[in-house]
Amino acid sequence: MFTASFEILDERFERLIFGNVHLEKLYTGCRWAEGPAYFAAGKYLIWSDIPNDRLMRFDETDGSTSVFLAPALNHNGHTVDREGRLISCEHRGRCVSRIEPDGSRTVLADKYQGKKLNSPNDAVVKSDGSIWFTDPSYGIDSNYEGDAAPSEIGACHVYRIDPASGEVTAVATDFEKPNGLAFSTDEKRLYIADTGATHVKNGPRHIRVAEVSADGRSLGPAKLFATCTVGLFDGFRLDTNGNIWTSAGDGVHAYAPDGTLIGKI
């Protein structure tokens, strides 16, 4: 166990941390750890080890770590829906799927307008049951984290899966490589990371935010929220006060709702 190191950039960050907090290494041995999701009812955490094609599970009750699923179709991001089921973004499956508590799998979306998705990356579930996900090309760019293949869609979009019909609609089409995403606490805004700098010189390395329409089915124009100062943003979540906690190249960055970088872990 190691004492956490904090960089305080704004007094608002001081109210979010405690001096006796520790960072604890839960597991080592992944080639590439990604996409954590916590099951509060079962007190366990799952995450992807993408190149090793497996999902791992850490049990909070006894501190043990085990393989949750292997092979795993190179899963990337995950979230838990309102019924406590695992929603998965599959690189090799090129789909968004749902895994029930009994282990059964249902493909929720694998095509848009008759064309295969690229390689879904991250997903969030809205309170109305709709699933919103990003679809960059990372899983089809090479065989390292999926199966190399050309993009049938020819672009990287953000999509919504309708909870009643299952229809897949594009809600944002002006991102280079959409990545992590999360709703504001009132679900009136959707924050989306763009990691296009991995493929385009001086490309995007930021989070943008878009207003959700009144009917909850579409987005307005996405505006710049924050630019990553070290590395790239990837996955992130909001706390109950609307602060964003996001991965970055030198740790976890915390942003206030107004877009100010207030601190780092």
Residue ranges of predicted features:
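Beta-rich, blade/repeat-based domains predominating
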Residues: N20-H22, T28-K43, P71-E90, R94-C95, ...
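Short loop/turn segments immediately following the C-termini of beta-strands
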Residues: I50, H91, P136-Y138, T195-A197, ...
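Short loop/turn segments immediately following beta-strands, especially the blade-tip
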Residues: V209-R217
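Short, conserved, GDST-rich strand-edge loop motifs in beta-rich repeat architectures
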Residues: F133-I153, A193-G203
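A short beta-strand motif characteristic of beta-propeller blades
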Residues: H22-Y27, G63-L69, T106-Q113, E167-A172, ...
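Beta-propeller domains
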Residues: R15, A40-A70
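Blade/loop signatures of beta-propeller domains
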Residues: M1-H22
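A short loop-to-beta-strand structural motif that recurs across blades of beta-propeller domains
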Residues: R54-M56, C95-S97, H157-Y159, H206-R208, ...
